[in-house]
């Protein structure tokens, strides 16, 4: 079967925003207008097509990125609906990695919110062109121009309006299209499916002309031909303007801004038109880069062509009753059911059992998938998030997806003996699906410890364990995931010599430890010369050091941002073995870490509190009492927004405290910012507690 939709008519987009800006509602409207659903699903009724997990329908939030395919004006659009809640950052990170473009939604009153900043930064990191949609224009206090200003100021981006609203709040009727200079009004009685194109209202004409001039001026800055016309006083044609705006958007010089209200069915069709007109097809983005698995210094590229060697990235896993579904984005070549593909991470080949196109939680079997498309594959047992799949004859390893480390952990134990084994299986399946969810066993207590990105994240995972895997568990109090690091360089040796009956054990290494850049993690350098430590014992030494990192020397927390150089050692012809060098590496590391001024690090959070003026003093005093630092304040609507950095340790239970101190009138959002050195008092308290004083 040949390709049905040419590559230039494909769009892979994500919908990204702060929680509650209306992402899922917007996607539901898109599915309705593109003819996929015959009834609009509502988030508040719990019937939204994209929110297909039970907890999503109960809580009215999107947890997993559901992928779906629809057609608009003969263009195939693959949409990934991403969660806006900070605890599910991993879902956003993995979606953006495989998208070509995105729609960023903004609340018409709040504008840029904390999670908007996070997802916007992730979009910048993966260089994803975006168009902006100011949603909820029917809301009291809606202010289109204020939102554009917050995009400019807080995101440092260049927004450019391609529409302006007609009316606002309850009187929001439609938009002025600044490209074609016409008014578009939606009819309520047709669920917004029909709209009329009219003359621009006289009272808006001047404003529309000023905004259009601004649009042409901004676009002309990046287009020589248009700049020349502009300076000559000529007006560009609609086609010229669209073409120049498309180029400027794909190059990320500008971000077109539209408006509407998805819930009231206004503005969705024009948003779809903009996706088609201004967001890139797989042909508009640079070829994907990777490395040669057999020689990591060789950089390779793959063009989005069907006749190129096959390459794809696995960006999401779902375990369901029918087996493991692996969502993949195909970058080059063609994949057919029954094909054998290579996973460079494992070095193993696997056979693709089935290929399915997903529509939220419904699926349609397909026989092949082409370059630039997204689908799910069944039968890939070894696939993990971020893995490359490629042709066995032309291997390539695409760059993996970076995920943040978990910041909070709780102990879980099964309620009954019978749940013990089931819990282990359930947790490993959940950890398979979610790279920011970690499971380990505490060496001292034997308890199972699960870690994640926040309280809601862990709560939902425990809930899924109960619903999907029928495992009842008791959950302990949440604990902060502290870390340890070092502040100066040191050297130490590890010597492991044991004589037991026949052959003995002999391992001897010398290492140099030094601080690594924050966020760089662990780095191992092999500086052995003259074979004083044979090649086959280098890897075991590194492994021993890596294992020792898991239990720091101060309070048993993982050590981060450390560089270890193996520079000397010795071996015994008969008694040396891998195990002896692994133990020697671990001993040397512990010894060196003790001498390298180890310190305790704690996660600090970026907190934003929206509070009425009269409660400002209370909130600021409370933040200071939690060891917080106020970073800035600004006016928004009738409230003040306070931005602060506060240690996570001090934020447990904040939701109840803030409610009671402001009679429920303040709200806050919080997300992980970074790790910072803990003050001495806190360090002593934690170290003392962990050493059982």
From Swiss-Prot:
GO terms for molecular function: GTP binding; GTPase activity; translation elongation factor activity. Keywords: Cytoplasm, Elongation factor, GTP-binding, Nucleotide-binding, Protein biosynthesis. Gene3D superfamilies: 3.30.230.10, 3.30.70.240, Elongation Factor G (Translational Gtpase), domain 3 (3.30.70.870), P-loop containing nucleotide triphosphate hydrolases (3.40.50.300), Translation factors (2.40.30.10). GO terms for cellular component: cytoplasm. InterPro entries: EFG_II, EFG_III, EFG_III/V, EFG_IV, EFG_V, EFG_V-like, EFTu-like_2, G_TR_CS. GTP binds at residues 17-24, 81-85, 135-138. GO terms for biological process: ribosome disassembly. Its main location: cytoplasm. It is found in: Cytoplasm. Residues 8-283 form the tr-type G domain. Belongs to the TRAFAC class translation factor GTPase superfamily. Classic translation factor GTPase family. EF-G/EF-2 subfamily. Catalyzes the GTP-dependent ribosomal translocation step during translation elongation. During this step, the ribosome changes from the pre-translocational (PRE) to the post-translocational (POST) state as the newly formed A-site-bound peptidyl-tRNA and P-site-bound deacylated tRNA move to the P and E sites, respectively. Catalyzes the coordinated movement of the two tRNA molecules, the mRNA and conformational changes in the ribosome. This is Elongation factor G.
